Every structure is written in C-alpha cells, then in structure tokens.
Regions:
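Glycine-/small-residue-enriched transmembrane alpha-helix faces in small-molecule transporters
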Residues: 1-30, 120-121, 127, 139-174, ...
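Loop-to-transmembrane-helix transition segments
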Residues: 1-7, 35, 45-48, 54-78, ...
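Hydrophobic transmembrane alpha-helices of multi-pass small-molecule transport proteins
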Residues: 41-44, 97, 101-107, 116-135, ...
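C-terminal ends of transmembrane helices
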Residues: 14-25, 73-90, 129-140, 187-198, ...
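Alpha-helical transmembrane segments of compact multi-pass small-molecule transporters, enriched
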Residues: 39-43, 94-109, 183-187, 215-219, ...
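Structural signature of hydrophobic alpha-helical transmembrane segments
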Residues: 1-11, 56-71, 111-127, 151, ...
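Structural motif at transmembrane-helix junctions in multi-pass transporters
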Residues: 24-31, 77-94, 111-113, 168-175, ...
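Membrane-interface helix termini and inter-helical loops of multi-pass transporters
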Residues: 48-60, 107-116, 138, 161-175, ...
Length: 276
C-alpha cells in the first residue's frame, strides 16, 4: 500500500505543478510541452543506473515510437490549454471516461461480462462532467471548442496508454519514456516563441514538479508489482485527493459544480472497485 500512497502523493503534487506551469507562468502549449518533456528526461536519466537501458529496435518499434510521440504531444498541448481554465481534479475526472472505454473494449473482446452497475456509474460520471461543464462560470465562451479539446485529451491519454502497453516487449518504461520525451522536446524547439523564458524561482518550480513526476513513475511501477488492487486505485484516489485539496484551499465552486464534482469522484471510485 505504501507504494500506491506515494504514487498518489507524487502525482497529485505533479498535477499542481502542471497547473503552475500552464496558468501561473502563462506558458504557451509549445513552451509547456518543451519544459515538461526536457526536465522529465533529465530526472529519468538519473534513474538509468538503477533501471538500466533496454530498448530493442525494429520497424514495428519505430512505428510505435512515432505514435507515442504524436499522442504525447497532443496530450501536453491539450493539458496546457485546459489547465488554464480548470482545476487539476477536473482534468482527472475526464480521465474517468477512459476507464469506461477500457471496460467497453474488454466487453468487445470477451474479457469482461456486462454489468448494469457499470453502465449506471458511467452515466453518473457523464452527468457529473456535464454539471461541471455547464456551471454558470464556465457558460461564457466556446463550449463546443472546450469539449473538443477535452475529448482530444482523453483520446491522447487512452491511445498513449494502449500503445505504451504494446511497447513493453521492446524495452523498459524508463528507456521508452526518455526517447519519446526527448523527441517531443526537440520538436518544440523551432516553435518556441521568442520571449524571456522562466528563470530563477520560476524555473525551480518547473524542475521540482518534474521530480515528483519522475518519482511517481518509479513508485507506480513498484505499486503495480507489489499489489494490483492498490495499483488500480491510484487514479481514483488521486482524483479524490485533488478534489479534497481544492476544497481545503477554498477554490471558488458553485453548488452545481460541487454536486457534479462529487458525482464524478464517487462514480470513478466505485467504478474502479467494481472493475477489480
């Protein structure tokens, strides 16, 4: 359980670090993608003496690497855009849809049986997301464009996870991540706007947020190896922790948004436990 608890802690800190980079430093999607990728590579490289470098190359591996780069760029861009207008827990609530999608794929492949309870919880999750979306403070602006970016975020996360699983036969996760994120960072170089880049305390915040991300990647692997039950609960527990943190810090929240948020958190937690 300790590994899962550490992972939730590290990833929750990272989520606020992402919010800091995107909203506080007002980084463009290109800047956000570059900083997040490059600094994460730095911390992951320090882990190589413990994990080793293992990555076999053939044409299928190269194809999957290209796909991972595409999905990771899309994930970072959408994250940078969304975190300017939403709290970190809201972003995690959207990821609950991926859990339902995974369940649907397992149904299609005959790996799971149909459960009415999961369908009800999926409807609760979608209802909660809709309540948050239609909150009066978010009503102004292009709702359609906002939803489109959220859906792109979900697709990028889902496809990245799916193809990362297929890459496991070619090497360890640290080696794959270093190569993918390094390519992502290099792609952003020509696209970086010409302005003064973060430095001093601002850059320290960026570096520390990636340290917790790298640490979370390590403890997540340990959690998966030690206890699959607690590993499965990492995502819903992180959503719960981020929501509680939002309440404790007194972030403005209407009754409608609060109700939708509680519905999302409950639906994701119960769905995770039901699918074990």
């Amino acid at each position: 359980m300790i590994w899962a608890a550490l992972t939730v802690t590290f990833y929750s800190i990272t989520a606020y670090g992402d919010k800091y980079i995107s909203a506080k430093l007002t980084c463009t999607p290109e800047e956000y993608t570059f900083f997040v990728s490059l600094v994460t590579v730095f911390w992951l490289a320090l882990c190589l003496p413990f994990t080793g470098w293992r990555l076999g190359m053939d044409r299928y591996c190269i194809f999957f690497l290209v796909c991972l780069v595409v999905w990771k760029v899309l994930e970072f861009y959408t994250t940078a855009i969304l975190l300017r207008h939403m709290e970190p827990y809201e972003l995690k609530a959207w990821l609950g849809i991926n859990m339902i999608l995974s369940y649907g794929i397992n149904l299609w492949e005959g790996k799971s049986s149909f459960r009415v309870s999961i369908l009800i919880l999926a409807l609760c999750l979608l209802t909660g997301i809709w309540l948050i979306l239609t909150d009066k403070k978010r009503a102004s602006g292009g709702m359609g464009k906002y939803i489109a970016v959220c859906l792109l975020y979900i697709v990028s996360k889902f496809m990245y996870g799916l193809q990362m699983g297929k890459m496991a036969r070619y090497g360890n996760s640290v080696s794959i991540l270093i190569l993918v994120l390094l390519i992502v960072a290099l792609i952003q170089l020509p696209r970086l706007p010409r302005r003064k880049l973060p430095a001093g305390k601002e850059m320290t915040g960026v570096i520390l947020s990636r340290l917790t991300n790298a640490a979370g990647l390590m403890t997540e692997a340990e959690a998966a190896a030690s206890n699959i039950f607690f590993y499965t609960l990492i995502q819903p527990l992180q959503l719960f922790v981020l929501f509680v943190a939002c309440l404790i810090t007194g972030r403005p929240m209407s009754r409608k948004k609060r109700a939708g948020s509680i519905l999302c958190v409950a639906a994701v937690l119960l769905s995770s436990m039901a699918l074990l």
